[in-house]
Swiss-Prot record:
The gene is petJ. Gene3D superfamilies: Cytochrome c-like domain. PROSITE patterns: CYTC. One of its GO terms (cellular component) is plasma membrane-derived thylakoid lumen. This is Cytochrome c6. It comes from Thermostichus vulcanus.
Length: 112
């Protein structure tokens, strides 16, 4: 009985791990599309045309406590200063996808 349970758990974990990259790629692709249509005017290439020191680069996100999906989601939903709130304009899924995209690009140095 115990061996069967362990086998079932191992299969479930293997399935989960094998499905994760495809799901992540789809989210990042959608995040890129959402970013391009809603964020790139001010944040092209991870920059910030309004507040030059508050970029979407990894170092700046870490410095300002924004290097997490939750922090970015909150910022996108609620806005701050010149940045508008997108909670009513974008779905929760779109906001989550754009947050994942921003973190992915920040980790890559916004190099593509």
């Amino acid at each position: 009985m115990k061996k069967r349970f362990i086998s079932v758990c191992a299969i479930a974990i293997a399935l989960f791990v094998s499905l994760t990259p495809a799901a992540l790629a789809a989210d990042l692709a959608n995040g890129a599309k959402v970013f391009s249509g809603n964020c790139a005017a001010c944040h092209m290439g991870g920059g910030n045309v309004v507040m030059a020191n508050k970029t979407l680069k990894k170092e700046a996100l870490e410095q300002f406590g924004m290097y997490s999906e939750d922090a970015i989601i909150y910022q996108v939903q609620h806005g701050k200063n010149a940045m508008p709130a997108f909670a009513g304009r974008l779905t929760d899924e779109q906001i989550q996808d754009v947050a994942a995209y921003v973190l992915d690009q920040a980790a890559k140095g916004w190099a593509g």
